[in-house]
Each structure stands twice: as C-alpha cells, then as structure tokens.
C-alpha cells in the first residue's frame, strides 16, 4: 500500500512502530479496552482535598494531558491529544480554570451538567445533557457543576 501521507510517520515518535515489537503487538498497544481501564480519583485529588465538592475521577484511554498526570503505561500513546472519560458525582463540580494552549471538548455520555464559559467581558452558561457536545476554545475560563441526581459521565 503506498504511503500517501505528506509527512513521515517516523517524525512523530508515537506514530512509529517500536523497535522489537511486531506489527500485531504495536497495533494491540494502540487499542484501549474498557475492561482494562480504571478510574483515577487521584488525578485531581489536590482539588478535592481543598474542597470535597471538587471530587471527580478520570479514566484515561489516550494520552495523559489535561490533569497533570505525566505518565500512564495503560494508555494509547499520543502526541498533543488526550481522550478520557470523566466521572462527576452528583452535586460535585469542576472548578473554573483556563487552558491557554488547547481547545477542550466535552461530550456528555450521561447526566446533566451546568457549564460556564467566561472571558474578561462575557459569561455564557448552559446545561449539557446526554449526547450534547461543547468545544471551548483556548483562553476562556470554563467550569462545570453536576446538577443532576446521579453521576455525570463525559468524554
């Protein structure tokens, strides 16, 4: 099969077949199965230690960004991309914060959250429910609150 890419896969470490791994082993390392995932309640524990209302867990599938976790051998390696689920217990919230270098996307799998997006002059608030998605550009503060009676689960 001809390589139609305008770049070389070898230029990006996580896109290159590791030395000593067969093609099948390499491709298997790029599959993240739900049964091998665990919820990491410690990734954002420093916030929950400040106030229990900030308790939430991350279940990583690809990459380790977004929460300051620097390494996780149980994820699909990635360059500049993170894919995880977040569990937000009823009544808990993600405090207002900003990412200046990345867009952040939330996709609601179940539950409902109140999402607030702000800059210096504006504020926006909405309720996200099952299968809703929002994209927050870099440079905006965002915060969320589980307004439902059950845990919220989002990508």
Predicted features, each with a name:
Residues 145-148:
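Asparagine-centered strand-capping/turn motif at beta-strand->loop junctions
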Residues 62-72, 82-100:
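Conserved short histidine dyad/triad with adjacent acidic residue
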Residues 119-138:
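Short acidic-glycine-tyrosine-enriched beta hairpin
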Residues 105-107, 135, 150-155:
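A short hydrophobic beta-strand segment most commonly corresponding to one strand
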Residues 1-80:
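A short, N-terminal "cap"/entry segment at the start of jelly-roll beta-barrel domains
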Residues 93-95, 114, 132-134, 138-143:
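Histidine-centered metal-chelating micro-motifs
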Residues 90, 101-114, 118-119:
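Glycine- and acidic-residue-biased ligand/ion/polar-headgroup-sensing regions
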């Amino acid at each position: 099969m001809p390589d139609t890419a305008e770049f070389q896969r070898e230029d990006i470490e996580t896109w290159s077949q590791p030395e000593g791994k067969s093609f099948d082993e390499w491709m298997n390392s790029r599959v993240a199965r739900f049964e091998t995932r665990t919820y990491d309640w410690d990734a954002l524990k420093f916030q929950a230690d400040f106030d229990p209302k900030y308790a939430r867990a991350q279940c990583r599938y690809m990459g380790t960004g977004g929460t300051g976790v620097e390494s996780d051998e149980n994820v699909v390696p990635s360059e500049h991309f993170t894919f995880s689920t977040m569990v937000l217990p009823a009544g808990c919230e993600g405090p207002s914060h900003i990412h200046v270098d990345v867009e952040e996307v939330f996709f609601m799998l179940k539950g409902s959250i109140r999402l607030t997006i702000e800059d210096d002059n504006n504020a926006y608030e909405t309720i996200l429910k099952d299968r809703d998605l929002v994209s927050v550009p870099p440079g905006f503060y965002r915060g969320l609150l589980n307004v439902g009676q059950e845990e919220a689960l989002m990508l």
